[in-house]
Amino acid sequence: MSIDINWDTLTGGADGAARAETIRAFIHDKFQQVTLPKFIRSVHVHSFDFGSASPEIEIKDICDPLPDFYEEDEDYPDNEDDDDDEAGLDSNPRNKCITRKGTNFKSVAISLVARQFETSHQSALTPGIPGGTSNINYFHLPLSAGLSGATTPLAAVAGAQLQGWLDNPYGRPSTPTNMRRLRHAASFNSLTLTPQSHPDPSSRPSSRHQHDDERRRSLAESDDASSQHGYDRTPSVSPHPMREKSPEDIQVVAHVQYSGDIKMSLTAEILLDYPMQSFVGIPLKLNITGLTFDGVALLAYIKRRAHFCFLSPDDAEALVGSDAGFNGLQTDSNGENAQPVQRPKIGGLLENIRVESEIGGQGSGKQVLKNVGKVESFVLEQVRRIFEDEFVYPSFWTFLV
């Protein structure tokens, strides 16, 4: 299902200018936090314009929100929303926007595996459905049809990384939010820590191994005793408060494509090291004149909050499938040497950024500075990094509506 966007209404007028200025200031502030290379003194963002082309949006699925969207935000609790309701319509909800960093991908995948374990146990006795109903309502996608809850795409990714990550003490998260993701995995692994308390007499070990078995048994019993007195080897962490789920909660999965004339103007001051180090700074103006974007977006509405983010290319391909495939033949200038052309994968995010540079002496066609190419590459890389750090899951934006 596709939808039309009134791009002029969103980007035009006073409201559109205010949105453009908000984006400009946001990108400018992010550049001030970046560690610059030695040949760049500063970077300033001067303007941002949405352009005239609108993105193409295709709704892929409507499903339940991700678990991370239910985490309680200490800065904006639910009771504050109730206070806003009582205060009337004086407050402007458009000004209330929160950016939040979720857990890393590994712990999110473990959370999805644990969630599917719970669902598979609850639906194991459902008659007439092979494999149970654990994959029903799992993003409601055709890709998950016929798969059990443990073999859905993200679960397969999580299972491949689960064992090695749990065995690595340096890879375990230390925050309470991340530790909450491990509670199910720890409960499953703990089943193998305690030996059998009453072994079969026919399988009793020989005398030379009996001492080692008794020693291991005593160590296990001491661990159990320590756990009963509150000295469990797994640190107990209070669970992160979660909002109550509601049947009205909804999440939209959409494929977003954009190839337009979005514009942004930046200035980078290049330092000259001749005749001495940092002798003088020359401004280099970079004009981004357009970009090509392909991504999968999540938009969830929970109570009075709207959560928005994009998915990484791997997650996007796992959730909505891949459009990669044969896309015809391409020949050279002579019409020979036909080569197959592959369609790009879905969810590649920022695929191309068009940029023009302006510096003194450009009109004469001479190369003024050899670092111009390096500056362009650095600025474009930072633009990509800012986008991925702020808008790609597990990072997401929350709007109070």
Curated annotation (Swiss-Prot):
InterPro entries hit by this protein: Mdm12, SMP_LBD
Compositional bias ranges of the Acidic residues kind: 70-88
Subcellular location: Mitochondrion outer membrane; Endoplasmic reticulum membrane
Chain residue ranges for the region called Disordered: 70-95, 190-247
Lipid bilayer topology: Peripheral membrane protein
Biased composition, class Basic and acidic residues, residue ranges: 209-220
Compositional bias segments (type: Low complexity): 195-205
Keyword Magnesium applies: no
Domain of life: Eukaryota
Protein family according to the UniProt entry: Belongs to the MDM12 family.
PANTHER family found in the cross-reference section: MITOCHONDRIAL DISTRIBUTION AND MORPHOLOGY PROTEIN 12
The protein's name in its UniProt record: Mitochondrial distribution and morphology protein 12
Native source organism of the sequence: Phaeosphaeria nodorum (strain SN15 / ATCC MYA-4574 / FGSC 10173) (Glume blotch fungus)
Lineage: Eukaryota, Fungi, Dikarya, Ascomycota, Pezizomycotina
